[in-house]
Amino acid sequence: MAKKSLIQREKKRQKLEQKYHSIRRSSKKEISKVPSLSDKWEIYGKLQSLPRNSAPTRLHRRCFLTGRPRANYRDFGLSGHILREMVHACLLPGATRSSW
């Protein structure tokens, strides 16, 4: 189980990313449209003035049960360890163990 503070920090980053997503996207579109370099520098300054944690690259996918940051499966939102336990307990419909 991950520390609760780390899970809360990740939730805070998600909220910031959602809040500033439209501003960040519109300013990036402006950069491609503006021909002069000085105007581009001004827009870059606006981008840099946004909070650091509002960047989507700062987000990290975590297991929603344990908060584990590694070995996450996107389809289920679970870490590999928990996914395996739930499949063995038949808690995930349609998931089967592979055998060959």
Swiss-Prot record:
Question: What keywords sit in the KW lines?
Answer: Chloroplast, Plastid, Ribonucleoprotein, Ribosomal protein, RNA-binding, rRNA-binding
Query: Main subcellular localization, coarse class?
Result: plastid
The superkingdom of the source organism is: Eukaryota
Cell cycle among keywords: no
Region feature (Disordered): 1-31
Localization (cell): Plastid, Chloroplast
Q: Which GO terms describe its biological process?
A: translation
Gene Ontology cellular component annotations, sorted alphabetically: chloroplast; small ribosomal subunit
Coiled-coil spans in chain: none
User: RNA-binding as a keyword?
Assistant: yes
Extract one GO molecular function annotation from the record. Answer: rRNA binding
Show the InterPro entries listed in the entry: Ribosomal_uS14, Ribosomal_uS14_bac/plastid, Ribosomal_uS14_CS
Homology family: Belongs to the universal ribosomal protein uS14 family.
Role noted for this protein: Binds 16S rRNA, required for the assembly of 30S particles.
What quaternary arrangement does the UniProt entry report?
Answer: Part of the 30S ribosomal subunit.
> Can you name this protein?
Small ribosomal subunit protein uS14c
Identify the species of origin: Atropa belladonna (Belladonna)
Give the gene symbol: rps14
